[in-house]
Amino acid sequence: MLSAGWGVPARLFSTLKRIFMKILKSFAALAFALMLAASCKPAEEAKYENTNAIWLWGSHMKEAPIQEWAQKGYGHILLNEAAFDKWGEEDVYAFIADCDKLGMTVHIWFQAFYFDGKWVSPIDDEKRAIKQDFYDMVIDRAKGYVEKGVKGIHLDYIRYGGTAHKHDFPECRATDSITEFCRQLNVAVKAINPDVILSAAMMPEIDSEHYYGQNPAEMGKYIDILMPMVYRYGYAGEDKSLEWVHEVSNWFEENSDQADVWVGIQTYTSNLENGDVIPMDAEGILSDCKDITNTNCTGVVLFRHGIGEFPDLNDLWK
């Protein structure tokens, strides 16, 4: 510290002291800013080169304009496994190969806990234990696809049908049963191909554990991409605000552990009086996609082909 005892003139000493104190304050401000920055979660960076995806029903596979989609900047197709029953394995795997040549990854989309038109609880209420035999059956389906070269597995109905709280026991928690399935699936398919992409459709609710058993923070430890279905038009009988879209999307990104979050959006609106579906034009869908780029999420998934006009998304994330 400067001292007047060094023989420095009083006026010069006073000037030097003021300069020195300003420098100290600047360093203190810089240190505080660095500390604040370190405490904040950094902006999420996409792990995948292309993060634009489409949900595609199996029955629509043959009509899907995949060359057009590739040109418009879509990189992932979530193909419902019903395509195998509709078209046969040979045609489905040929479709997957064609998409791969165009730079698009096909994920097989199937229902985890919805079988033969009915919800299946992953917990045996009498035994108060998970239904391991059912887990094994579903996981074996996924393993079969990965063994044949499928690069992505997309889980739909990876939840309870609104009744999780009725199957929740101290010995076997409802949320744990969903997470445990994700863990077992991860271990099984990554042993075949460590790079296979696991994704899951999520209910668009900040607290979905009570009804659906989904805990994104735990599921995100085993699932690569969480896809909350943030359907703002006609959800629960009303159109949701843009603020709701941002709030839900960002909540998932903040509570997804290591998983990426790609937001599912509609390609249609709804008539709130009679429920009729109203296809959206490309401009409207693009506007909703751009809204997602204003969140901390890193991708969009359009639901679905067959309704609405898909926009060009090549410049969406630039």
Regions found by a protein language model. Name each.
Residues 57, 107, 178-212, 259-268:
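Aromatic-lined carbohydrate-recognition surfaces of secreted/lumenal glycan-active proteins
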Residues 43-69, 268:
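Boundary/entry segment of secreted carbohydrate-active catalytic domains
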Residues 137-172, 301:
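Active-site groove signature of glycoside hydrolases
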Residues 92, 96-97, 105-148, 278:
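Active-site-adjacent "subsite" loops/lids of carbohydrate-active enzymes
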Residues 231-237, 262-318:
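Substrate-binding cleft of secreted/luminal carbohydrate-active enzymes
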Residues 60-85, 148-152, 295, 299:
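Catalytic domains of carbohydrate-active enzymes, especially glycoside hydrolases
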Residues 78-114, 169-192:
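Aromatic-lined substrate-binding rim segments of carbohydrate-active enzymes
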Residues 212-242, 305:
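Aromatic- and acid-rich polysaccharide-binding/catalytic face
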